[in-house]
Structures are given as structure tokens and as C-alpha cells.
């Protein structure tokens, strides 16, 4: 199961306990970046009156020029904030290398300051894993030399950190 599906299960359990229900929409489109998303926000997020958006472009924004990716990432955030009461949680799934072993820069370095400016909480999966383990622990979440697509254990780990973050807000 993907981290999104596992996070949905967590929400369903919380909703049951509180007598509520959730309407889960996974509006992510595989392989797309924030330049594509900025054109979809109105129809896919705001129109559907989402309560929470998990924003994750740490892999696919890499291919955009820096000025464009920063503007479009911020554009997605601004549209959500200006047109709805939707909460935003940013997710940074940091990548280390592509399938040929070439190191890739982390988008967290560019996206986190934008999130900080708008006071958007985030989960940095790699930072969370390394805080409690080692680089070898992080590498175990992949089955191939590329560290872009996590295995099932990786998805479970991502979901666990997201749910931990959300549980903290729920408990407040």
C-alpha cells in the first residue's frame, strides 16, 4: 500500500472514533510537477473542498528550472491558502540518486523555506529516518539502486511519520 492509502486508513480510524467520516481524494498525478499542479488546484482541490492537502513535489519538481519550480510550488500554496480553509502539510521525500547512481539535489532545500514563510508544517521523511537511525536504515526502504521509489516498507515508514505529525495536531 502507498503512503497515501495508509494515511487514509489512519484518518478513517480517527474518524470512526470521533463519529465522523472522511472523503479521501488522491489528486496526485504520477510524474507531474508543481507547474502542472498550479493549473489543477481550482478544479481538483478547492472545488472539492478538501480539508487537508499533503503537498509533495520533491521528486518531480527537480526537472523544472529553479525559478519556475519555486514560483509554481508557491503558486499552489497561495491558491490553496487564498481560496479555501484547506490545511496543508508538506511532504519531502528526499531522493539520493537516480537509477544510474547519479546524486540528485533535494528539493527540500528550496521548498522548506517557502513552507516556513507560509507557516506550513512539513514532514521530511529522510530527516525523520536519519534522526532515529542511520543512512543504512534509509537505504533499506528501497529495492533498487535508485532512491526515488520506496518499497512497501518505505511507504509504511512515510505514512508512519505523516500520521505521527497529524496525531500531534489531533491531540492538541
Predicted regions and their residues:
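Solvent-exposed loop/turn segments at secondary-structure junctions
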Residues: 1, 29-34, 59-64, 94-99, ...
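Serine-esterase "nucleophile elbow" of acetyl-processing enzymes
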Residues: 1-28, 40-49
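Oxyanion-hole/transition-state-stabilizing segment in secreted/luminal serine hydrolases
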Residues: 35-70
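Structural beta-sheet core signal
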Residues: 55, 90-92
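Charged helix-capping and loop-helix junction motifs
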Residues: 68-75, 105-109
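A short helix->loop->beta-strand "cap" motif at the edges of active sites that frequently abuts
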Residues: 81-89, 120
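Substrate-gating cap/lid alpha-helix
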Residues: 94-127
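Histidine-centered active-site loop/cap adjacent to the catalytic His
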Residues: 121, 138-171
